[in-house]
């Protein structure tokens, strides 16, 4: 199967599902059997999964150390990951490793322990990100939570399982003008 055919078929493939496995560290995935659904996972000749979805929700992960290496061991084309579900874990930050998956369009991070709203800035480099969840994290309590996320990630169409409307975008822009100070341009002084 060539890469183009893979891209066309793997979107409909079932996810590689490690949810509800009490996984503490990413490396444990290598020795863990994924959950099975109604449709079996397709595998490459090398035995790796042919899917673009990885579900790690409802575990006890507190970091994503070695995520890239493990994804490469489990998936035939980890660079094509389009959906990662890390909801209901113990993550305290958005790990920069997630920003290396440029095809990521769905990212679930709800129900974790992410404190700081500024963590969202890391996701701005993901050009295809369209659906994001962050509710149930301490950051949700920060003033302007929804507006900040929509300003930082203007290309998302669904946030916390709610569609992003034109009114949401307008409100976010007004909020941005009122709350985010523009960076001042530095003026170089002539040192003659």
UniProtKB/Swiss-Prot annotation:
Its main location: cytoplasm. Pfam families: LRR_9. The keyword NAD does not apply. GO terms for cellular component: axoneme. It is found in: Cytoplasm. Keywords: Cytoplasm, Leucine-rich repeat, Repeat. InterPro entries: Leu-rich_rpt, LRR_dom_sf. It comes from the Eukaryota. Residues 137-175 form the LRRCT domain. LRR repeats lie at residues 49-71, 80-101, 103-124. This is Leucine-rich repeat-containing protein 51. It comes from Macaca mulatta.
């Amino acid at each position: 199967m060539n890469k183009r055919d893979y891209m066309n078929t793997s979107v409909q493939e079932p996810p590689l599902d490690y949810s509800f496995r009490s996984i503490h560290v990413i490396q444990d995935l290598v020795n863990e059997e994924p959950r099975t659904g109604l449709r079996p996972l397709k595998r490459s000749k090398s035995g790796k999964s042919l899917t673009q979805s990885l579900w790690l929700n409802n575990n006890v992960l507190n970091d994503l150390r070695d995520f890239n290496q493990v994804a490469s061991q489990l998936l035939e084309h980890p660079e094509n990951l389009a959906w990662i579900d890390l909801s209901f874990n113990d993550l305290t930050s958005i790990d920069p490793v997630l920003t290396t998956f440029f095809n990521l369009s769905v990212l679930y991070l709800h129900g974790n322990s992410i404190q700081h709203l500024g963590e969202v800035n890391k996701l701005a480099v993901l050009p295809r990100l369209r659906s994001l969840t962050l509710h149930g994290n301490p950051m949700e309590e920060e003033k302007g939570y929804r507006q900040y996320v929509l300003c930082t990630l203007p290309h998302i169409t669904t946030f916390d399982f709610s569609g992003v409307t034109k009114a949401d975008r307008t409100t976010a822009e007004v909020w941005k003008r009122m709350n985010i100070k523009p960076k001042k341009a530095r003026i170089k002084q002539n040192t003659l």
